[in-house]
Design a protein with these regions (language model features):
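Long, continuous compositionally biased terminal/linker segments
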Residues: 40-80, 86
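Active-site beta-strand termini and strand-to-loop segments that position acidic
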Residues: 41-46, 112-115, 125
Length: 127
């Protein structure tokens, strides 16, 4: 469905370190960049995720009610995402990492805010 998602970052280096750590815990390589517009990219064959300063020159701000979810291959990877993200400047939010059961079955989730306030999570579908 998506080709890429880009979020704004006020401190590119702090955000790059956060995503290198958190996405690295999910098995991704460090971000590539900066590109000519100062963005860093994490790519998979399914799509890409990027951070950068807003092109309009205004400060980056997070989406109130928005979340970007990254897939994990195990509950251990979800916990590793959380631990690495917190150690790299992310802020713990919502419930602690763990299982939640709802209309989509049982999920293992961990939620963080990146250094610019963007809400991200790691998700593993249990069973």
């Amino acid at each position: 469905m998506f080709t890429h998602i880009t979020v704004g970052a006020n401190d590119i280096e702090a955000s790059r370190k956060f995503y290198d750590a958190a996405l690295g815990a999910l098995g991704h390589e460090p971000g590539q960049g900066p590109d000519p517009k100062g963005r860093y990219w994490w790519r998979t064959r399914m799509g890409a995720f990027a951070i950068g300063k807003p092109i309009d020159g205004e400060p980056a701000c997070h989406a109130n009610g928005g979340t970007i979810g990254f897939g994990a291959k195990s509950a251990e990877m979800v916990q590793a995402f959380y631990d690495a993200g917190v150690a790299a400047g992310g802020k713990a939010i919502e419930d602690p990492p763990g299982e939640r059961t709802g209309p989509f079955g049982t999920l293992n989730l961990a939620y963080l805010r990146d250094p610019s306030g963007n809400k991200v999570c790691a998700l593993y579908r249990v069973g």
